[in-house]
Amino acid sequence: MAENGDNEKMTALEAKICHQIEYYFGDFNLPRDKFLKEQIKLDEGWVPLETMIKFNRLNRLTTDFNVIVQALSKSKAKLMEVSADKTKIRRSPSRPLPEVTDEYKNDVKNRSVYIKGFPTDATLDDIKEWLDDKGQILNIQMRRTLHKTFKGSIFAVFDSIQSAKKFVEIPGQKYKDTNLLILFKEDYFAKKNEERKQSKVEAKLKAKQEHEGRHKPGSTETRALEGKMGCLLKFSGDLDDQTCREDLHFLFSNHGEIKWVDFARGAKEGIILFKEKAKEALEKARNANNGNLLLRNKKVTWKVLEGHAEKEALKKITDDQQESLNKWKSKGGHAGGRFKGSHVFTAARRFKGKGKGNRPGYAGAPKGRGQFHGRRTRFDDDDRRRGPMKRGRDGRDREEPASKHKKRENGARDK
């Protein structure tokens, strides 16, 4: 049996091979990897290299046993062992896995970092390359939509709280000239919760104002419109089809508070309503981006609305909000609910109607069908796969060895 750790210099390929195998058997992945955990029970922890080369990412690097053995022999991590006949590998018994206790889970959470600002077509290898000199990373989770599209943000787990803190405190970090939003994972979720609370407060205030406005025709609406003059910013151009309202909130996050965005994904123009003057927010954002204010790396025409165009846009905003509120209420909702899209900007509340067992149902629910009750607890983010899993993927937490058809890292079939 040969242990790794020789002081020979690694080639770039050997370094990638070691990194990949040590990830598979590492503290973060192995406890979550059902397939590998089953394999290591069969032969005192040994896993045949014939099995390992079926793992997609290792398979793309090499299928040559000698190359793998040679690479592991040069690793300084001392995590892996190679069998005497050089056909099997295992995690060294002298490096047992940490016990997955609440304390351990809390430690992992404290060294996890949220990073946003990557292009949606970035690959796991692109992100790994960017993070290569940022500290030792144990895991990268690419956050995806329900349709498996990359959101442009990740969660990265560092090897220690100190290295995570050092990374977070680096000012002005960019990915290919794009500013990145970097927060500790716990701070990110706290920020999202605070935004939801603020939305609920604004929703209640808006509902109250609309209720009072019905008793004073014209007066409330007029005052509201006057208070928003100079606060509208129009944007237009050959926008990316994946451009969304969240991109605008991120772009102006430190320059002006956005109250409402009239924009639908796929459109080529839209309007932003700021709490304060739009001109000031635009100037601050431009100055922070060296005068070149892009949206998903696309050129955009920015224009502060004035005069007749401004009045018409404000009137449309008010009308759309009221129309959406009326439609929702007609389905059984109460004033003060939150609507997504280019309509009312308020927070969700309880719906009318009753579900199974005389419990509250949801607006527009089909009659005669039972509903789920209670709340579903989610961990990490809203992109976690549902249902039983044989193995995950390397960029998401785990990876499954390829069978007859190999898998891509985004879940599609390799060809």
Curated annotation (Swiss-Prot):
Q: Which residues form the xRRM domain?
A: 226-346
Q: Name one GO molecular function term.
A: tRNA binding
Q: How is it modified after translation?
A: Phosphorylated.
Q: Which residues carry this modification: Phosphothreonine?
A: T120, T377
HTH La-type RNA-binding domain ranges (all copies): 7-99
Q: Which UniProt keywords apply?
A: Acetylation, Nucleus, Phosphoprotein, RNA-binding
Name all RRM domain ranges.
111-187
List residues modified as N6-acetyllysine. Answer: K116, K128, K327, K356
Phosphoserine occurs at which residues?
Answer: S92, S94
Q: Which PROSITE patterns match?
A: HTH_LA, RRM, XRRM
Example GO biological process: tRNA 5'-leader removal
User: What are the subcellular locations of this protein?
Assistant: Nucleus
What are the record's GO terms for cellular component?
A: cytoplasm; nucleus; ribonucleoprotein complex
Disulfide bond sites:
none
Keyword RNA-binding in annotation: yes
Q: Where is this region: Disordered?
A: 349-415
Basic and acidic residues bias spans:
377-415
Q: What does this protein do?
A: Binds to the 3' poly(U) terminus of nascent RNA polymerase III transcripts, protecting them from exonuclease digestion and facilitating their folding and maturation.
On assembly, the entry states:
Interacts with DDX15. May interact with RUFY1.
For this protein, the record's PANTHER family field holds: LUPUS LA PROTEIN HOMOLOG, LUPUS LA PROTEIN-RELATED
User: What is the protein name given in its UniProt record?
Assistant: Lupus La protein homolog
Q: Which organism is it from?
A: Mus musculus (Mouse)
Lineage, uppermost ranks: Eukaryota, Metazoa, Chordata, Craniata, Vertebrata
